């Protein structure tokens, strides 16, 4: 007898007042609105067919193109090196980087919402701000969401460029006065010192890359270092985490 149950999908969309919109995707690419500009970028997970005709895709202000080992953005005249946009009532500096990234991951918004809810519930219950550690903090989306909700946040990244970018985003979002510690360091090295100090955190946020700079000439490789990272993270987690 055939199973008549229909497979249900859960699709999340951002509020229309936000500056981001996924316009179309397919054939290994995605077309996105980032504030005032439309970007076309590769996305290997977009295995389906595009819905828009090529004319729609041709309206992109910048397109990330790979030719062999070379990759670069093809930009229309007067395309800016930087602009700002709103996302989840936070403000971000957007740039087209050499790795096709823009400085934010809009798909993380649902997690920011969940984090804020957890933090606000904890504050309502215990009348005390939880302490959150954000490792591989990048440009600070999760850091800003947690700080806005009332948490004390320690933001760690091995890239000075990312740290500076995150701090500018905090300024743009009006959160410069929030209790955020900005730490330029390798995640594992930082955790080892925190373990020795006996420091504890009520929540940990981690979005490690597969491969990256770990500072001081070291290299991060997720297949080699992730298990150690999790072990260290467990040691700094408080007895009453969020």
Residue ranges and their predicted role:
Residues 3-21:
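Short, Gly/Pro- and small/polar-rich lid/capping loops
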Residues 16-32, 39-106, 113:
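Non-catalytic substrate-recognition/targeting regions of SAM-dependent transferases
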Residues 106-127:
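Conserved alpha-helix/loop element of class I SAM-dependent methyltransferases that forms part
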Residues 127-138:
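Conserved class I S-adenosyl-L-methionine
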Residues 139-153:
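Conserved SAM-binding loop of SAM-dependent methyltransferases across substrates and taxa
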Residues 159-205:
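S-adenosyl-L-methionine
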Residues 187-242:
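S-adenosylmethionine
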